[in-house]
Amino acid sequence: MIKLLLKFGEKQFMERVRDGHLYFTNALRLRGIEKELLIKGQGDQYEGKTIITGHRLTLGDGSVHNGVFNVIFSLEPANKLPVFCLYTCFEKDCRQDSSGNWVPQLSDDVKDMVSEHFPKADAVAIISNPEQFIQDVLVEFGDGCKHGLVKYAPTSDNVGFLNDMLHAENAGHVGSVYFSLFRKDTFFTKEQEYRFVLSDKEIEEAQEISIELFNGCNIIVKGLDEFFDDMKGEL
């Protein structure tokens, strides 16, 4: 069960999240962050893609070649769907304080991941009522908003990718290509992502989209050093 949701980033942007201004990106941008800025973690050059391995390749001229061939497969309509990502705190990632409230208690491995994958992050937005936050997002965007936990599997798991594609199509979802944005390579497992994907919208570049946060949605922003210091001595 999800206890908390966290967003790591620069303080000025985390304060915007606190006020309901969510920074959505897209698959093209996430690929570029790794390929151009060389930040693997925040970025992923295989975002929304899978690698299909074949042993027989037929070219357009009809010629046939035998061997081992890796083909990178992606769904172009998913490239510009808006994506908003969060870190998920389960019970194993938390503790209860003296008032019975859940507070983050991340492992050293996860702390290291945050520092390595999000090198510009100096703050964290802590969402203490995930259910209310999720509901607020759904109220704003309606049925076109797909949300849930990311599935982690090898990028080469094309069978799983294709099965998910068939499931999404059979379910009759609007913009069923969104499913490809809920799969990531096992390298990213520690990110424990919860994602919102707007399957009926497109954005050319990352942009802020505002929602109304209702009274039950409490978001606190802390400096990252303070956030990590609060966990010391509490294990």
Residue map of PLM features:
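NAD-dependent ADP-ribosyltransferases
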Residues: M1-L235
